[in-house]
């Protein structure tokens, strides 16, 4: 079998919340200013905050969100990468959860629909958010169009100019993208005055988006890191679990990339549910990231700000520092300085391990994958591919099954690939 599909009437109708199953209680956020929690309550939709701290293990997905999931391409298929299996020696079964098949081209639409829906239900004038490479921004733009909401997207400055096609996508959906830091907010103007040549960062863009929402009657929505965002995205993992069971397959390894953590967590957490409940971890969980932003392999597990402007409460997570300005690598979605608290806790407990790969290694595998499987991965997604070679080499003489979160396609990133790989 090459492709495993779910029919729309077989799609899961619940998200998964990992909080009740964590091996220990998640460290509580800290507010050192006395203002961060109030800011959070004003900026974020109340229903999103309710999910953020909920103890309900399997909350039901609202019907209107389920309908929109189906409208934008859910359920997504699982594809078996048989040619890549042959290239790696034939001892692996490699299954790809194809989140690139959604209308926005990535996994980001899974939570964007929920965030925008809850903002609309609360009567917000608009939504504002940050985006790195533009996958989240284009997903929010699409979700806002479907729910008839205005959206303002603060896109990391280097990506705003280096990745114009996702910006154009946002315009097509009726959104308002802005380079961050921008002249559009007081905070952005202050940053530009201090650092006129800054490439920007996701931390900066988060602060701008929050300030804009607070100052203009909108609601801020986060594209990763927070528990509620991961919960909304677990529709992917819930589908994948059902698909693998239908096919009679049980993954030994679950692999995916981490920018802030929601992509990998959304696939891995539903599989971890039974293992955490039983206290016995039987699969191997590996998350990969960018060596240029080595938060997982060189970061510290400590309290840090999720945004550069120190607007939000401190979270305990793996971090290389809220004020870290990452280099202008093409995998813009991996440039965030920290890892989601839930995923960080699992990493700290040794349940999830981490790898970081530099752009050259990741893009080498992006090209190999494109030539063997005929599908071009997003630059971010390509950072998961070197893990497959490691797994194949480690298990010579043994058959292993690997499930990969194929988080997005690279069709809008061909200009970046052309520069990095020196195409004519």
Curated annotation (Swiss-Prot):
InterPro entries per UniProt: Trp_synth_b-like, Trp_synth_b_CS, Trp_synth_beta/beta-like, TrpB-like_PALP, TrpB-like_PALP_sf
Modified residues (N6-(pyridoxal phosphate)lysine): 108
GO cellular component: cytoplasm
Catalytic activity: (1S,2R)-1-C-(indol-3-yl)glycerol 3-phosphate + L-serine = D-glyceraldehyde 3-phosphate + L-tryptophan + H2O
Record family assignment: Belongs to the TrpB family.
Subunit text: Tetramer of two alpha and two beta chains.
Name used for this protein in its record: Tryptophan synthase beta chain
Gene: trpB
